[in-house]
Amino acid sequence: MISGILASPGITFGKALLLKNEILSINYKKISNQDIHQEVKKFINGKNKTICQLQEIKNKTQQKFENTQSNIFEGHIMLLEDDEFQQKIISLIQDRNISSEYATKIIIEEHAKTLEQLNDEYLKNRAIDIQDIGNRLLKNILNIDIKDLNNIKNPVILIARDLTPSETAQINLKKVLGFITDLGGQTSHTSIIARSLELPAIVGTKNITEKAKNDDFIILDSINNKISINPSLEEIHRIKQKKKKYESEKKLLIESKNLYAITKDKHKVEIGANISTIQDINNAKKYGAECIGLYRTEFLFMNRNYLPSEEEQFNTYKTIAEEMKNKSIIIRTMDVGGDKNISYMNIPKEENPFLGWRAIRIAIDRKEILHAQLKAILRASAFGKLRIMFPMIISVEEVRTLQYELEKLKQLLHHQKIPFNAKIEVGIMIETPASAIIAHHLAQEVDFFSIGSNDLTQYTLAVDRGNDLISHLYNPMSPSVLSLIQQVINASHKVGKWTGMCGELAGDEKATLLLLGMGLDEFSMSAATIPKIKKIIRESTFLDVKKLAKKVLLQPTYNEVNNTINTFININNKNK
């Protein structure tokens, strides 16, 4: 049995189609001074041909998906049109007398290596995009035909080392049953595509392409993280029954998506969605989100060569406000820097980016960026229920500085007679032990907290979850992390404020009852998880889960925490 990283839930079975990536062998090639002009011309022609192809792929993608996917190719085109990128390659050809393809290979590998070394999973996965652009550009420089993947005739499970944006844009996705890849994580392109199409996917299997062959019969169970190659007839019969049951349960969950998350003894919590783009709102609505618990604005700042203007940001926030029709939207100010290095912002390279110049630290130092974003949010607040949230807070001083800047901008808009919500709520992310420990002070300064469980876990346990040697130590349900979460919730409630959570823990089925019992007021998660979490809450009793939380918080180890929760769930299931 093969497993990997669960990227998109579902169960499917069918024949394998193995996509083997062609590896281009580009060797060092010295050229004479007389050939330099011709090699530069060869590069420019190849670059222009690549841009035309990407524009065509972008147009096709807009028909298949929404702008969120076609925007990937906009970023690819922008890189190819970037003067600095072009000049680096041309300079190598001219200064070192090397062929256009070898110069291109060097620069592409430099770009990809820079991304691969980052700690941020999303940006690390963009290295595949760079390699995809490079592969296409090199083929065009060398006049090698690029194969057409649009001719899939029968339903298949696609198996690949990794799927690039340009490959998925060309594939006949109507014939795809699911995806399995050697590489990738939750934020890789394959995962994003699979979730948007609601197709089962398991990524990061390490070696599926070595184990499966074309036309092998594959069972892909991305609920239980199991892949089976050429199973027995008995296994096929079992998976058919399992798939039928899963589809039936999924249908019932979707039908009940708009029911509120209210326990049997009438305790209500709010369930929201985390989004990164305007297009994500469609999924949020589809799965019954009552609010947007986290809008990650940093994606507005990425895949471009300049800062988004106040006007561009205003139009984006206004659209989201109008789309959500008076439902709450928490807009987190840009969380970039350190590992999310945006070239045009000139963020210095740091030894330890997770402890470096990032998020609100950049905003306080670069007030023109902060002011443009806050003004855009304030202006958009006239069109819906927007809330502002600041990330990476460690002190009361930071909060007061940010509140002061916000008040100045409110006065400016008031003098300019520009409408905005003067009472817009302001909250902070609790994602550092520092902010959790002084939550009782911070609760006096803001309207709400939202716990970023991913970073809070990482900082509390001093564990880089991207480091394979120690990733097993990363555990958001360790007693130390749970203790801090409870401390934060209690601090907010003591002064009549509320606490939400927008990290992965908020959408973890096993953690739901515990967090509910701890008093969490709002859960924000990936949209597809919402119906299941709502159902778990509706089937629970607040009085019982409060007792569970009290018991769990007394446990000294994760195993004892886990056993306590499992025992509670098993007893509850028997009593249903």
UniProtKB/Swiss-Prot annotation:
Highest taxon listed in the record's lineage: Bacteria
Documented EC number(s): 2.7.3.9
Gene Ontology CC, one term: cytoplasm
Entry keywords, A to Z: Cytoplasm, Kinase, Magnesium, Metal-binding, Phosphotransferase system, Sugar transport, Transferase, Transport
Family matches, as Pfam families: PEP-utilisers_N (PF05524), PEP-utilizers (PF00391), PEP-utilizers_C (PF02896)
Xref: PROSITE patterns: PEP_ENZYMES_2 (PS00742), PEP_ENZYMES_PHOS_SITE (PS00370)
InterPro entries: PEP-util_enz_mobile_dom (IPR008279), PEP-utilizing_PTS_enzyme (IPR050499), PEP_util_AS (IPR018274), PEP_util_C (IPR000121), PEP_util_CS (IPR023151), Phosphohistidine_dom_sf (IPR036637), PTS_EI (IPR024692), PTS_EI-like (IPR006318)
Cofactor(s) needed by this chain: Mg(2+)
GO molecular function annotations of the record: kinase activity; metal ion binding; phosphoenolpyruvate-protein phosphotransferase activity
Protein's UniProt keywords contain Transferase: yes
Gene3D superfamilies linked: Phosphoenolpyruvate-binding domains, Phosphohistidine domain, PtsI, HPr-binding domain
Residues reported in the UniProt entry to bind Mg(2+): 431, 455
Binding site for phosphoenolpyruvate: 296, 332, 454-455, 465
Enzyme class: transferase
Function text: General (non sugar-specific) component of the phosphoenolpyruvate-dependent sugar phosphotransferase system (sugar PTS). This major carbohydrate active-transport system catalyzes the phosphorylation of incoming sugar substrates concomitantly with their translocation across the cell membrane. Enzyme I transfers the phosphoryl group from phosphoenolpyruvate (PEP) to the phosphoryl carrier protein (HPr).
Domain remark in the UniProt entry: The N-terminal domain contains the HPr binding site, the central domain the pyrophosphate/phosphate carrier histidine, and the C-terminal domain the pyruvate binding site.
Family named by the database record: Belongs to the PEP-utilizing enzyme family.
Entry protein name: Phosphoenolpyruvate-protein phosphotransferase
The organism of origin for this protein: Buchnera aphidicola subsp. Baizongia pistaciae (strain Bp)
